[in-house]
Amino acid sequence: VQLNLVKKTKDSLMKKPHIWISDLTHTAQGISANTFPLGASYVYSYAKQQLGKDFNFKLFKFPDHLAEELKVRSPQMLCFSAYSWSFELSCKFASLAKKRDPNLVVVFGGPNFPTDEVEKFEFLQKRPYIDFFVELEGEFGLVDIIQRLTEYNFKVDSLKSYSEKIINTSYIFEDHLISGSIERIKDINVIPSPYLTGALDEFFKLPLTP
């Protein structure tokens, strides 16, 4: 009975669409950012709490690990933290993954994004592989993106054609910048602790600072 239960659990995980969240670090000369992917793990924990029944979420820190997984399958959505020290690395992964699977939804989120509307447009226009960029609280933005895309069977152009405004999120459609309302987290308790939920357990085994 236990073996059958394990098999059913694995089968259900395989069938559920995969959403991967990455906070990458350079590793050519040691681990450049040798800390836990804390910010991304909060987004991961909140998204899993809200949508874990329907999607299989996974958290990545190391480029080699992400590259190996991408060789096996393409997820439904690939998300990246946007920090200045790893931005180009994330962009390279995003562009290659998008080229391999044009239907892949690519989401970026983080502080490495302009505040001026014109600069936002230029930023996204130069990076067409980025489908959506989430500002400020990534937790609310990512969940809203997933929920909206679910209504459109994850067809990005269909969603964008209706100029859907997504919380904390900007995107380009037909040379227009579409930005949703900004919502801040008012109660930190709505975000599950990634330490208590086990989201960061695997990273304790690695040479990283919690």
Stretch-by-stretch model annotation:
Residues 1-13:
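Short, Lys/Arg-enriched N-terminal segments with co-localized hydrophobic residues
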Residues 28-40:
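Glycine- and acidic-residue-enriched helix-capping/strand-helix junction motifs
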Residues 43-49:
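A short, N-terminal amphipathic alpha-helix
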Residues 189-190, 194-210:
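Radical SAM [4Fe-4S] cluster-binding motif and immediate context
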